[in-house]
Amino acid sequence: TKLVYMKFFTKESNKEIIIASTRPELLCACKTVIVNPKDERYSDLIGEKITVPLTNDEVIITPHHSAKIEFGSGAVMVCSYGDQNDVALFRELELEEVVAIGLDGRMTDVAHEYKGLKPKQARTKIIEDLENAGLVEKIEDISHRTPLSERSKIPIEIIPMEEYYLKQKESVEKMKRLGSEIKFYPEMHQQILMNWLDSISID
């Protein structure tokens, strides 16, 4: 996988900040840049607006402990549905979601001129456009774990869809009672059910 070091610029001071990402095709879905609050390189920039390359969107630099000081430049762009970490951060920081990849596996309208491309195609084209604009500091080849479909071996993308959720907490005791009346083969599976029921803490 290619780790692309891209040039972002703060709005007020026009200070260059390098942000490394393996997903430059998701620049259009970037809604904040996080830095570790202990990272002295960025302590004076927290709260400032920063301009996303190519899209020219403005996002806020946000302190967050999950930004690893030693990885890349220490500054991380957070894009909705980039990976599970991004999803968790979007929920925690209550950011507005942007759906960059559709159900057809192609870039959506928010990707503008990259609309209709597959993510890998968009990545290649965006890296080329970033380089032509002088917005790439360097590119590194790295080993990167990517979840793959078991059947097709194609990288899995997180795509938001409507889902229905059932209330669980109020039925835990009833489920335990029913579970204790069922004969399990092997018997240890009954304990697996009970352990799972004990782990339910939210609806």
Model-derived features with residue positions:
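NTP-handling and nucleic-acid-processing catalytic cores
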Residues: 1-104, 128, 132, 171, ...
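Active-site neighborhoods of enzyme catalytic cores
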Residues: 1-26, 118, 122, 138-168, ...
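A glycine-biased structural micro-motif
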Residues: 44-47, 113-124
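Short secondary-structure junctions
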Residues: 49, 134-141
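Alpha-helix capping and helix-loop boundary segments enriched in small/acidic/polar residues
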Residues: 74-81, 114-118, 166
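Short glycine/serine/threonine/alanine-rich loop segments
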Residues: 95, 116, 135
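Short acidic beta-strand-loop surface patches of small beta-rich interaction domains
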Residues: 105-110
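Two-metal-ion acidic nuclease core segments, chiefly of the RNase H-like superfamily
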Residues: 119-135
